[in-house]
Regions:
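Short, well-structured N-terminal submotif of metal-dependent ribonuclease cores
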Residues: 1-42, 49-62
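Conserved beta-strand termini and adjacent loop/short-helix elements that scaffold enzyme active sites
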Residues: 43-45, 70-71, 143
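A short acidic, often aromatic-flanked loop/helix-cap motif at beta-alpha or helix-coil junctions
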Residues: 48-49, 73-79, 137, 146-151
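Short, contiguous, well-structured surface segments enriched in hydrophobic/aromatic residues
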Residues: 62, 66-68
Length: 154
């Protein structure tokens, strides 16, 4: 199965806060299967963001085997993004974002994130994944759109 989705850490963090694994087991089981079956990946840089948390979300992602390590092709796209938007990446805040977009571009996958675009006059420092992804030809969907695409009902 080819990778269809690249998951932003904010999706998993929001799930953990609003749909805890011990209560929403069917949601988490389906999401785990999506990752385990190779239909979705989490870039290592997004995993690093998860590791800053106090829960076991990073360990859960590692267990699925869905952590994606950037290769030279991904690094080249990250460099293009950084050149185009030099003020966008702030290490403590969004260091994973260009890797999420670059991974999706290289794999021909869709980014899943909870971020929304800002207006076109937004300064680089305030850009969001959907704006940058659009410029690089990468499709972005929200979590509920992912569920609809997969036909998931809860």
């Amino acid at each position: 199965m080819s990778v269809l989705y690249v998951i932003d850490s904010d999706v998993l963090i929001t799930f953990e806060r609003t749909q805890p694994r011990d209560i929403y087991t069917s949601l988490w089981d389906r999401f785990e299967a999506l990752l385990r079956d190779g239909e979705a990946v989490v870039p290592r840089e997004a995993l690093t963001e998860l590791e800053r948390g106090t829960d076991d979300l990073a360990a859960w992602v590692k267990k699925t085997g869905a952590v994606f390590d950037a290769d030279d092709e991904v690094i080249a796209v990250v460099a293009q993004i950084s050149t185009r938007y030099p003020g966008w990446v702030r290490l403590a805040k969004n260091a994973a974002d260009p890797f999420i977009i670059a991974t999706a571009k290289v794999l021909g996958a869709v980014v899943v994130t909870n971020e929304h675009s800002r207006n076109s006059a937004t300064l680089d420092v305030n850009l969001r994944i959907p704006q940058v992804a659009a410029e690089f030809g990468v499709t972005v969907v929200a979590t509920n759109d992912l569920f609809r695409q997969l036909g998931w009902r809860f």
